[in-house]
């Protein structure tokens, strides 16, 4: 952050606006919301980014736990050998997909919406494959590819979020966007996947003939599972990782909704983007 501050000069306010755009002071929240209500592209994009964040935060919160349960590795091994390459791939993919969408936008303005929409859709089969294969290497490859293709929405959310409103509303538009995305994504993504996993665990235990109050997930933890009877240990072996696996697959599948919202944004951009309608 310090290097950026010292080496990158902030462009003048309105530098990227179309010629002739009048500079005005920032507006209050109410006026900003009124302008945003006339921009369907903003709300479709916000819905898509929110779903993507919801799924992403949920998956990332439980990814290491899943790898430990499903493949028998340690948390440290999951972090170093799986999560680090996935994070690197995601960082490169964020830049690559953002750059691609920006380049295509010059001739095809809809690209800023359909590139991330396609990316989110493409990530689904790779995530499902990664969460269902028994091969750790193949799981890692699936996660790496999924991480690479899905993050185009990050560039899109800021480009569209600022591009559909007048200069004086941009900061407020991004504030509204991030409030919704972070509230639902951070707040409910991990909670949702944990709750779904618990439901699958309880149902799995009952299906194997064990009362719900007789066996909890915590009792299946490797550090204490030896205290259980052989029968309960067997039940743990059946449902401990499978319940989380099912939850991860469901969460990954929800990226389809995020993809759909970005594709719905696409036809609105010609009308809603300010640089396409400078008047």
Predicted features along the sequence, with ranges:
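Multi-pass alpha-helical transporter architecture, strongest
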Residues: 2-7, 124-133, 246-279
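Flexible cytoplasmic inter-helical loops of multi-pass small-molecule transporters
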Residues: 6-31, 272-279
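Extracytoplasmic gate region of multi-pass secondary transporters
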Residues: 34-97, 127, 131, 142, ...
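Hydrophobic alpha-helix/TM-entry signal in multi-pass membrane transporters
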Residues: 41-46, 116, 139, 248
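Loop-to-transmembrane helix entry/capping segments in MFS-fold secondary transporters
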Residues: 75-79, 167-177
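Transmembrane alpha-helix termini and helix-breaking/packing motifs in multi-pass membrane transporters
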Residues: 98-102, 187-239
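Cytoplasmic membrane-interface "Motif A"-like loop-to-helix N-cap segments
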Residues: 102-119
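Paired intracellular helix-loop junctions of major facilitator superfamily
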Residues: 105-107, 161-170
